[in-house]
């Protein structure tokens, strides 16, 4: 679905009469084996190795199928007299990027969707509402999360999402994506989670 959506977006900026989206040869057994391998790893809250664009597409399809019933994913905190450590992302192979943001009370970040990006949110300090809406649908799902009990919310592709600081103190959120940010190809499309008038 993501490749088809990208082909439609690309078609808007070309004069070509015929466009052929990229394809990958595989078998039903190959797809089943990949999905099984991904689920075995993902069931533990970890990110499986995504070797090819087809792997990314299949993993995004699996995540969409599991959403929202699979979320939030609880995280284990390891505490001692120094404080606590929480492993938020364990990725099997590949590249990725982790970053942290702070958000003032009442402020919302996001209001966009992705076609291929695998993205994970973990609130590590403060309180927030993470809201998501599937493209072309009206229903909005809200997850109320807190840094006191960190959980994982992964953003499915083709779901508009945002995060709002609902607390009275600064919100600290850790994000992980499976790709390094590329300003020339950000895979980020603006759209509000709650359109005006809804």
Model region roles, listed by residue range:
Residues 1-75:
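Mid/C-terminal beta-alpha module of Rossmann-like enzyme folds, strongest
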Residues 71, 76-111:
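A short glycine-rich, His/Asp/Glu-containing loop-to-beta-strand
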Residues 94, 107-120, 147-148:
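A short beta-loop-beta micro-motif enriched in histidine and acidic residues
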Residues 94, 103, 123-125, 135-139, 160, 164-198:
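Double-stranded beta-helix
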Residues 116-117, 149, 159, 169:
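A generic "binding-loop/recognition-motif" signal
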Residues 116-134:
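Glycine- and acidic-residue-biased ligand/ion/polar-headgroup-sensing regions
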Residues 134-158, 164:
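Short acidic-glycine-tyrosine-enriched beta hairpin
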């Amino acid at each position: 679905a993501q490749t088809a959506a990208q082909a439609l977006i690309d078609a808007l900026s070309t004069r070509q009469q015929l466009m052929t989206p990229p394809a990958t040869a595989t078998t039903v057994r190959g797809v089943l084996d990949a999905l099984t391998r991904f689920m075995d790893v993902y069931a533990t809250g970890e990110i499986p190795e995504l070797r090819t664009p087809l792997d990314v597409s299949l993993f995004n399809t699996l995540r969409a199928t599991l959403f929202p019933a699979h979320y939030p994913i609880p995280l284990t905190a390891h505490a001692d007299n120094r404080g606590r450590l929480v492993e938020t992302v364990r990725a099997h192979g590949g590249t990725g990027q982790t970053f942290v943001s702070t958000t003032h009370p009442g402020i919302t970040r996001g209001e966009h969707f992705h076609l291929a990006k695998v993205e994970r949110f973990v609130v590590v300090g403060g309180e927030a509402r993470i809201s998501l809406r599937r493209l072309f649908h009206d229903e909005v799902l809200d997850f109320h999360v807190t840094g006191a009990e960190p959980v994982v919310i992964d953003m499915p592709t083709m779901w508009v999402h945002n995060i709002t600081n609902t607390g009275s103190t600064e919100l600290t959120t850790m994000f992980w994506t499976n790709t390094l940010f590329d300003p020339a190809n950000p895979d980020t499309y603006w759209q509000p989670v709650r359109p005006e008038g809804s």
